[in-house]
Amino acid sequence: MAEREQIRKQLAKDNIEFLLAQFVDIHGAAKVKMVPVDALDAMIDAGAGFAGAAVWGAGQGPHSHDMLARIDLQSYTPLPWMPNTARFASDLFVDGESYPFCPRTNLKRVLSEVRDAGYIFNVGMEPEHFLVTRSEDGTIAPWNPDRVDQLAKPCYDFKSMAPAMSYLQDLTTSLNHLGWGVYQTDHEDANGQYEINFDFTDALTTADRVTFFKMATSQIAKKYGAIATHMAKPFADQTGSGLHVHFHLADVETGEGVFEDHSDSRGLGCSEIAYHFLGGVLQHARALCAVTSPTVNCYKRLKLGTGLTSNRSGFTWTPAFVSYGDNNRTQMIRTAGPGHFEDRTVSAGCNPYLGLAAYVAAGMDGIARKLDPGEPNLGNMYARSLEEIYASGTEILPQSLAEAIDELEKDEIVRDALGVIADEFITLKKQEWETYLGQVSAWEVDQYLTFF
């Protein structure tokens, strides 16, 4: 009751009139009901009702009982673009019982198992996104109001970033008012592409923040006449958007990280536990791709061969191999510092709740089985021929959604991390792949219409 009264006072102080009870569907898309602030008690005790059959991947039919979204008071987030409204991340219940098809609830289940093993999973996610415009015929282009963001290598370029600074400052100020600790923002490697970095925290809070970040970018971008997209690869000749994951485990009692060890014989400053966790991630990497790169479009980003230099900037900045190394951005997993890993495969469109649940389960399997990731790769993976890659025994990441889903179906650890969501996810993704195969693209028409 004390927490309830405290949030009631905060709502009054912030002049909040409306609440959003918000959860995500299987794709990670935010779903909400808006209720007046006077309904706070009902949102805590019962929740806002939803017909689950209207939501992707909710495991319900039109005959099913309502899903009720009960708000998590610790997730209180005023909307910077709508000051009289606040969002609460929510967990789903059906008939008074916690509903396992809820991605947030599922992540909490997995994190509870991690805590029981003595650890806290701490994560930083780096969301890249594009600002685009869309013409009446449906074609898109990078948002470029001053026609200056046209360089082949626009990364970090002042003139390319300048037109977007008002948008980026608006977004950064909004997030920092919420206590996120945004510490840097930059123009990324593609025209109209940006990255915002905010503080490390526990995995559940990070997933809540990434979800809200997507909500915020979509609304703030509208003020500037742009569409914010978290699609992995909106342009064939531009670098794709990732959601790079920085991760480590901390001791549940002390809060101290357990991945750092300066006596590391491999020279990366990592502990035995860190290497076992890493071994688990690499062991399950191909199945993880289905969850962390969950759309057809994601595999235009995780591509092999000549595609490595097909981007205007000359590089994809995206790995295609199951590998780890030192501070080396051609690897799947980069060791950014002692005990500090970054996974570069994760795509911007990842559902963070499902992605992080699968990810930590893979790592914990590595700890349980004491898996060894082998020696780090210290060279430029982009410079190696496919023959060299194959000869070294290095696995290649899935090159299509279908291939990734095949790997997921065979991987009990990753499937178990998704719980009952796994079968629903696999079914939907197979349908997505079949729908994609049935499409006739503009490229096919251009290539073959008068070819014969």
Predicted regions and their residues:
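Glycine-rich, acidic/polar active-site loops that bind/position phosphate-bearing ligands
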Residues: 1-452
